[in-house]
Design a protein with these regions (language model features):
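Hydrophobic pocket-lining residues within nucleotide cofactor-binding pockets
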Residues: 13, 64, 85, 100
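Nucleotide-sugar donor-binding/catalytic module of glycosyltransferases
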Residues: 25, 46, 79, 102-103
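Catalytic cores and conserved motifs of cyclic dinucleotide signaling enzymes
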Residues: 30, 67-71, 88-89, 100-156
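Conserved long alpha-helical elements within nucleotide-processing catalytic cores of c-di-GMP signaling
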Residues: 1-8, 14-44, 50-54, 58-62, ...
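Catalytic core regions of nucleotide second-messenger enzymes
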Residues: 51, 80-94, 126-131
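Short aromatic/hydrophobic contact patches that present stacked aromatics
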Residues: 58, 96-97
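Short catalytic/binding micro-motifs of nucleotide second-messenger systems
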Residues: 41-46, 77-88, 120, 124
Length: 156
């Protein structure tokens, strides 16, 4: 790599199970094909788009650091907003990014970092769709889940 960095984006479809359950697996398959083509159309020529399984995709960005991956994420969001305008069932994507070597020195660690970032994005997107009165309870529940011992945040 020319400048010694590259980034990995982990892309997960939001609410994909609902598409399969309510519209059928054939529609789910068409949705996955649509997303794969959408991603391929909106990355640079030398970027690599892979479906890793289920409703997850990985995009490898050679010679792109954090700034480059952020630009691509913004471009994907804008293009997705435009593409969703004509869709009966809008598609949502949660995207996490990680940059080598800052976020991991091995492929496994880099993917773990991108996965954690994607999960945080997905949680923020879900929280944004909750009625306002349920958000504090949701935040508390997420805090409880992150404690290393799995116990309550206050108490005994």
């Amino acid at each position: 790599m020319a400048d010694g960095v590259f980034s990995v984006l982990l892309v997960d479809l939001d609410d994909f199970k609902e598409v399969n359950d309510t519209r059928g697996h054939a529609e789910g398959d068409r949705t996955l094909i649509w997303v794969a083509r959408f991603l391929e159309r909106n990355v640079r020529d030398h970027d690599i788009v892979c479906r890793t399984g289920g409703d997850e995709f990985v995009i490898l960005l050679p010679n792109a650091g954090e700034a480059g991956s952020s630009l691509l994420i913004d471009r994907l969001r804008s293009a997705l907003d435009a593409a969703n305008a004509g869709r009966v069932t809008p598609i949502g994507l949660s995207i996490g990014s990680a940059t080598w070597p800052d976020n991991g020195s091995s492929a496994e660690r880099l993917l773990e970092s991108a996965d954690m970032a994607m999960y945080q994005t997905k949680q923020r997107r879900k929280a944004a769709r909750l009625p306002a009165k349920t958000i504090p309870m949701r935040v508390r529940a997420m805090e409880d889940e992150t404690l290393p011992w799995g116990g309550p945040t206050s108490g005994s």
